[in-house]
Amino acid sequence: MGKYNLILSEYLSFIYNSQSAVQIPIYYSSNSELENRCIEFHAKCLENSKNGLSLKKLFSEYSDVIQNATLLSILSYSYDKYNAVERKLVKYARSKPLEADLTVNELDYENNKITSELFPTEEEYTDSLMDPAILTSLSSNLNAVMFWLEKHENDTAEKLKIYKRRLDLFIIVASTVNKYGVPRHNAKYRYEYDVMKDKPYYLVTWANSSIEMLMSVFSHEDYLIAKELIVLSYSNRSTLAKLVSSPMSILVALVDINGTFITNEELELEFSNKYVRAIVPDQTFDELKQMLDNMRKAGLVDIPKMIQDWLIDCSIEKFSLMAKIYSWSFHVGFRKQKMLDAALDQLKTEYTEDVDDEMYREYTMLIRDEVVKMLEESVKHDDHLLQDSELAGLLSMSSASNGESRQLKFGRKTIFSTKKNMHVMDDMANGRYTPGIIPPVNADKPIPLGRRDVPGRRTRIIFILPYEYFIAQHAVVEKMLIYAKHTREYAEFYSQSNQLLSYGDVTRFLSNNAMVLYTDVSQWDSSQHNTQPFRKGIIMGLDILANMTNDAKVVQTLNLYKQTQINLMDSYVQIPDGNVIKKIQYGAVASGEKQTKAANSIANLALIKTVLSRISNKYSFATKIIRVDGDDNYAVLQFNTEVTKQMVQDVSNDVRETYARMNAKVKALVSTVGIEIAKRYIAGGKIFFRAGINLLNNEKRGQSTQWDQAAVLYSNYIVNRLRGFETDREFILTKIMQMTSVAITGSLRLFPSERVLTTNSTFKVFDSEDFIIEYGTTDDEVYIQRAFMSLSSQKSGIADEISASSTFKNYVSKLSEQLLFSKNNIVSRGIALTEKAKLNSYAPISLEKRRAQISALLTMLQKPVTFKSNKITINDILKDIKPFFTLSEAHLPMQYQKFMPTLPENVQYIIQCIGSRTYQIEDDGSKSAISRLISKYSVYKPSIEELYKVISLHENEIQLYLISLGIPKIDADTYVGSKIYSQDKYRILESYVYNLLSINYGCYQLFDFNSPDLEKLIRIPFKGKIPAVTFILHLYAKLEVINYAIKNGSWISLFCNYPKSEMIKLWKKMWNITSLRSPYTNANFFQD
């Protein structure tokens, strides 16, 4: 098999290069004779290596194994207590180490001082400000780079230049790290005080970031950007990323649009050859000049020069360099501040009395009216979700922290835990569960805090509120989100849209008489001035709503919600500062409530409307669109005359003045051609995304394993690559090797092969070919998949003990009783399983499962166990289909223009041939009639897996299922007896298959699968009416064609002659497909 195994073998020789080191390849085969040879081969290898004999002879003796069997893993052992990293590093440490400038950052601890200067004693030390939070070490990262450098030192031509650029940058890192010695990590991949005390505090996180950057260098420009960022981020740990990325908000306003894509009435992207000139007032250039000056003051030279050079003609062709700088700036790593500073940040804005009360009044009223509009239908019709809001809240209760650790009893087991779900169970068992009382968060019970770190911004604090707040808000917020789903203004929630739709919406109305106003309101969201009008607006809305109903339960739901707002208007937080816990009154809005996203969107919409209504007194314009997307809002205004420099300047100043009247510290800009918001930016009529995901530093530690993190690393690499930031693939593969290896003893280590890591089993980590998800159909692939399925789910004694306790059982049966009107095993078992799965976030349980998983894996990687599984996977289905397809060459012309310039060539090619899609394919069954029927009468939300299982049951079983969830018998009868039911079977199967094939992830989400251009390459004669079979045949064909085109840059045409006799067999099989969860699918999901 591919490149991975080759690199793995080279990597092992590089790492274990002493006399005593041995590599033993382990093979397997689905052919039983060959399998026996594999076993023999392995036994003899072990025998020889124990006796210190060479393995060379065996390799030739068993050439049949090496040729025809599949590599399963490589067992490597070495008796070297290897400090190899230090030894190898010296070779590269040949320049002057960097010296940190200790005066750059305002906060003392953000300067890169020697650790013992920042933390004189071990008690004071914390790694929380520099913790890379990833389960791989600096020494591994250094090894991976040195491996790459050694492997490529004899490259020629263009490749040699890349080698030299990277070598040059690595010398800087190596020299600096070498001066202090490589910090050794402990078993949890953390860096302790005695390791760090004589080293610069930020050494590790800086080195990780630098390695990530230097391994992403290809061109000379990359080299200049990386060098500057590597050198300066050693000292500047606070403002560098912000300085470098600030100019983008203005740059997008400088590029003329010459042809662009716009959204048409059918919500598709359509090319428009319109020309829109960038009208830029001098004031804007002055602001840009100021930004470039600030960059130079901070020591930047090359980056401001690149921007300056680009300004000469502001062309879209050279804009990719600007996009590159913008993306690179995030890779300097996370800015991690102390909690106290993060909290005080929002509190130090001084409060002025000099505000426009009239505007605040309007703002509050707009919030009030929007809340009413969102909820009035549900309230007037006494919606069941609002009646059973408490149950709905419990069913979707998360297993995150509840803010305090408590001692809990489950049967005979006593545990202490902070998890919400466990606290709820415990409270119910002990009669302390009172969802009708929202605990205060005042000075008597201040709120514990979480944190959110992100590159280029300050640390933000997050409220960890008691679970009562979640229960009180859940149902109401869900209703608000349903409203937002079919309201175009809410770009983030708008039904099944993706970012391309939002892009077409903006460009649609740009013309010579329009301007677009875009504002970053993140400062406003967390400002004190916002909190009173914001909460009051919501409270007033809830009061109006409460008068629209006579249903006591609905009124109670609204009142509890109102109570959360009242409590939060008087909030105090607890912040650890050294050994003391400080309580401060915190008068601002922070994330952590269920309503955070929805309510912020409402407030931001109200804010931009308030501002627009103000400036409409002075100008005459039509508002073509208003959008709010997270912390950003934007609006396109159309005037009756052509826009001039003076107009842009005046509107800009008036808008800023208007925001200032509300004391809103926001960055508001006006342009005629482009916008820049946190999620995306539009320049020259094209759409760009920031490729700013850090690979070798993480924001925080979770309870994911090394395997999970290897999959996340790969997934992050793919997203960055689609967005225009490419890291060397060999380096990424080397990291995957390191992170997926399993230590057996101190000197014994097992490295899984490519087949193990890329087959879609429960252990899948990456794709053997970027952007292409392959479903193996060869005998060996299916064999290994089965083998892994046999050991997929691991038991945990602690989890079993907890779920056997009365506390747990009573909780689950209480939920079932409240939910169900009659017995329903599927749902009861579902709830029990969901609750049991939530226990996984309790560390001892996940550790126990991990250990079991590792030991099962170790057995499997040394000798796969044949397991006759009767489970059918998507691979089996595709294996059945594959033989009936014949392939021939075809040609598709490139007919669409580029609109996403950062895409890799091969992905871009597909889009230019078949077009793109602006919607998400429905893959959760929510559009099916049965799902809608259930949500009409019950708060229960079945998953796509459950719907798939239910819809294939007998009709009377489906009726019972529905009736047990409270659906009236007449409705259940009508459903089962109607055509809709058979349409649902098809629709749910379709959703389920889309879900299995990850059609909304990676680069597949960009392609138009219903493109006529794609359809015409596929010929499948119609035989018999089995739509599900027709569907799977077509989808398989489309994926084959697209995958072939990604790989080869050319098109094929497929013809399928599927025998009618096989169709029924296939159809039956399609109702038994097992879905596989793997680190890979979790990483995809995590991207969402």
From Swiss-Prot:
Q: Which GO terms describe its molecular function?
A: nucleotide binding; RNA binding; RNA-directed RNA polymerase activity
Give the EC number(s) listed in the UniProt record: 2.7.7.48
Could you say which cofactors this protein requires?
A: Mg(2+)
Record's keyword terms, sorted: Magnesium, Nucleotide-binding, Nucleotidyltransferase, RNA-binding, RNA-directed RNA polymerase, Transferase, Viral RNA replication, Virion
Q: Where in the cell is it found?
A: Virion
Q: Which GO terms describe its cellular component?
A: virion component
Q: Per the record, a Pfam family?
A: Rotavirus_VP1
InterPro entries registered for this protein in UniProt? DNA/RNA_pol_sf, RNA-dir_pol_4-hel_dom, RNA-dir_pol_luteovirus, RNA-dir_pol_reovirus, Rotavirus_VP1_C
Enzyme class, first EC level, given as a word: transferase
> Can you give the residue ranges of the RdRp catalytic domain?
501-687
Q: Which reaction does it catalyse?
A: RNA(n) + a ribonucleoside 5'-triphosphate = RNA(n+1) + diphosphate
- PROSITE patterns given in the database record: RDRP_DSRNA_REO
Whom does it interact with, and what assembly results? Answer: Interacts with VP3 (Potential). Interacts with VP2; this interaction activates VP1. Interacts with NSP5; this interaction is probably necessary for the formation of functional virus factories. Interacts with NSP2; this interaction is weak.
Q: Which family does it belong to?
A: Belongs to the reoviridae RNA-directed RNA polymerase family.
Provide the protein name: RNA-directed RNA polymerase
